[in-house]
Regions:
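Short glycine/acidic-rich loop motifs that flank beta-strands on beta-rich extracellular proteins
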Residues: 50-52, 74-82, 114-120, 138-144, ...
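Sequence/structural signature of small/polar-enriched beta-strand/turn repeats
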Residues: 1-2, 78-88
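Beta-strand-rich extracellular passenger or scaffold domains
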Residues: 40, 47-50, 72-75, 86-87, ...
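Surface-exposed loop/turn motifs in large extracellular/passenger domains
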Residues: 57-64, 87-107, 122-132, 146-160, ...
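N-terminal extracellular ligand-recognition/capping segment immediately after the signal peptide
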Residues: 29, 33, 37-82, 111, ...
């Protein structure tokens, strides 16, 4: 089995030792560039980085990075970069799905930003995958940058948990590239859970949780917190769950999104504002069967808009304590009944 593993993978510990307390950034970068079209495996242990490690997007030189469950890439205290620990496709930008090697991935392990670094970014390439990763103490957990194909990045992210650094600028996932799929994710310790500055994205079973800690412990910062901030258009949300953020879902007037089976709740009333959906401009999306649990008689809204006469629709909302709603704007866009539990 030992020899089989070395046939299947480039074993990092044959070249770079973990748990030394020393910077291994340059050694890992050299290992990546010297092993094109290989899967590079990181056994358990801590690997300290003073700067990002970058993989090529060119399919003939691309690599996949696979970490054991308890292998950890951690930013050193001396980290000064405004980038991620791992930058997929950054070493050699490329745009192709035709050349073998275009589909590469990052899988497993732990990325620890040490409160300074971002977790992982997709800088170039097509159809890059990130999965089964634990991302901790980051300013931005995952950053999908402008895609190589006319801004389309086509990334696939699933089974990832993210805990941010509790700053008022922290973001779980930032999407600038189009046409990505995010599924089965848990996010906490951030000010914004998911920020989509692009379109054509599919979001399913995502659960951002707001935690009162660090800069986010201040109520004045809570008021600008958003679980799902959409600044793009034509995005699809299915079974997405906002937990305690001041605003669960925000969108622009240009947004033509579909929200299905959203779940929204607040576990405390300490900050006094509960917004389920907020349109910056007119409301032009479709919301189907949202489940909303308002906590108490605070300033509550199922929908707020900054401009009237939108063409959006809210279908069959299920609301716990509908009597707590103080902004009745949603009635102008309501289709079907409001479903409330009998008391």
């Amino acid at each position: 089995m030992k020899e089989l593993n070395r046939d299947m993978y480039v074993m990092v510990t044959d070249y770079v030792k973990p748990n030394t307390g020393k910077d291994v950034s340059d050694d890992l970068q050299k290992l990546i560039l010297n092993n094109p079209n290989r899967t590079i495996f990181f056994p358990d242990g801590e690997y300290l980085l003073s700067k990002p490690i970058c993989t090529p997007a060119n399919p003939v030189n691309a690599v996949s990075l696979k970490l054991a469950t308890f292998a950890k890439l951690k930013a050193m205290d001396t980290w000064t970069e405004k980038e991620a620990l791992v930058r997929m496709g950054a070493a050699e930008p490329y745009n192709s799905i035709y050349i073998p090697g275009s589909n590469y991935y990052f899988e497993g392990g732990i990325l620890d930003g040490n409160g300074k670094a971002n977790g992982i970014s997709i800088d170039s390439g097509r159809e890059t995958a990130i999965h089964h990763v634990s991302i901790k103490n980051t300013e931005i957990g995952i950053h999908i940058k402008w895609g190589a194909n006319n801004r389309s990045s086509d990334a696939d992210v699933h089974s990832v948990n993210i805990v941010g650094n509790h700053s008022k600028t922290s973001i779980g996932v930032l999407l600038e590239g189009h046409d990505n799929t995010l599924t089965n994710m848990r996010i906490a310790g951030v000010h914004v859970g998911i920020q989509a500055d692009s379109g054509g994205n599919i979001f399913r079973n995502l659960h951002p949780l707001y935690i009162y800690a660090g800069e986010n412990a201040e109520d004045e910062n809570f008021f600008t917190s958003v679980a799902f901030m959409d600044r793009g258009n034509d995005n699809f949300y299915d079974i997405c769950y906002s937990d305690q953020f001041c605003t669960a879902f925000s969108m622009l007037s240009s947004s033509r999104n579909i929200y299905t089976n959203s779940y929204i709740m607040w576990y405390t009333t300490r900050s006094g504002v509960e917004n389920a959906f907020k349109a910056h401009g007119s409301f032009n999306s479709i919301i189907r069967m949202p489940h909303v649990n308002f906590n108490a008689e605070t300033t509550n809204a199922l929908l707020t808009v900054t401009e009237k006469n939108g063409s959006g629709m809210i279908e069959y909302p299920m609301i716990n304590h509908a009597e707590y709603i103080t902004d009745q704007t949603y009635l102008e866009y309501l289709s079907g009944n409001v479903i409330t539990p009998k008391t």
